[in-house]
Amino acid sequence: VDNKLNNLILVLNCGSSSIKFAILDPKNEKKYLSGIVECLFLSETYIKWCCLEKKYYKKIGSNMNHEDALNFIIDEVLLKQKNIFNNIIGIGHRVVHGGNEIKKSSLINDYVITCIKKYICFAPLHNPANLIGIQTVIKKYPILSDKNVAVFDTSFYQNMPESSFLYAIPYNFYKKYQIRRYGAHGISHKYVSYKISVILNKKFDSLNLITCHLGNGCSIAAICNGVCVDTSMGLTPLEGLVMGTRSGDIDPAIIFFMYKQLNMSIDEIEMILNKKSGLLGLSGVSSDFRYFEKQYHLTEKAKRSVQVFCHRLSKYIASYMSLMENRLDAVIFTGGIGENVSLIRELVFSKLFLLGFKINSKLNCSTVGGKSGLITESSSHPVFVIATDEELAIAKETIKIINKK
């Protein structure tokens, strides 16, 4: 380990069935340790981590919950790396929903915790996990209890105009219950937007961008003069694009039909739209894009699923062009699918030729596996692939907030 280890940040991202963790230096952008616990609540929970170029893998039990897994991470992984662990000066937590109240990254106090609890109803899979992460770490590591920062996925969208965030339902639902578009993946959309400002050598607040975060969850954002003006996810992360297991946009009356005609319960319907739909629902086989890439030319169900996915995405890109005020600086693809699946980019932009997009096939095929770069011809609107790094983004926000104290 080099001797310049100081001012490190521990980043925690507690998902519904996984926990990602990393220790990094936000200044030199170096990751000293990173890992993931996967398959919580299932028969085999396991952990993979990487420390100083060495990789580790371990099965750690069955039916583990978030608290068990966090205790394992801290006791068995982090504390074994004393010289790294002892230089942590702050902890950054990804929190999915801050609702209408929390506009930006915040030091965690009782008020912030109350807000995270309050908005569990809008992020039932994520906010409870985020909360357990925060509470466990504060309990395990009281010396840093006032150095925990919540970085919200919703804060990037707090300046959207009413025309974007209001739903056309009685206005009272917004005034009384805060029902509106909130968006998600804000940390990733913001990170790649800042990255492109460096690549293009333009001020962030002069940029017009369309950013596409495509992973197991998928969302798209329109950014005008550095401000997000629209995004595809809504009150919850269920709206918008086709996703791994989520439906994205549907006619709301489908829900009434399932309830009344098919006698399904609300819980069943919610589970179907969140866990059994999207690519998994369309194909009946998988939500993993590696399957679709292999099978696209071989099976009808894979082709069908990918075509629905691309149809929806190209429609959103086309509609967001209308928000660009006469200039588009770049379209960005990021996330596991956005960065790695050249097929999707090819299919999506072949539909957008009329709007001035032309993919360079060679660049498109070679820009995968964490590589970033331009994938279009010089005559086209620029499309870039940019590898996202949510952990680094959270670490940078965390140190900024801690230094403000």
Where are these regions (language model features)?
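Adenine-nucleotide phosphate-binding core of ATP-dependent small-molecule kinases
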Residues: M271, G278-L282, F289-M324
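Phosphate/pyrophosphate-binding loops at sites that engage ATP/ADP/AMP, CoA/4′-phosphopantetheine
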Residues: D75-I89, K140-Y141, I196-K203, I317-D329
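Structural signal for terminal/edge beta-strands and the immediately following C-terminal loop/tail
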Residues: G370-K405
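Glycine-rich phosphate-binding loop of actin/hexokinase-like ATP-binding domains
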Residues: Q158-Y259
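Gly/Ser/Thr-rich active-site cleft segment
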Residues: H93, A123-V192
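Glycine-rich phosphate-binding loops at beta-strand->alpha-helix junctions
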Residues: D329-K351
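Short glycine-rich, Thr/Ser-proximal phosphate-binding strand/loop in the N-terminal lobe
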Residues: S18-N63
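Short beta-strand-loop/turn "lid" adjacent to the catalytic site in phosphate-handling enzymes
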Residues: V77-H126, K147-V149, S155-L166
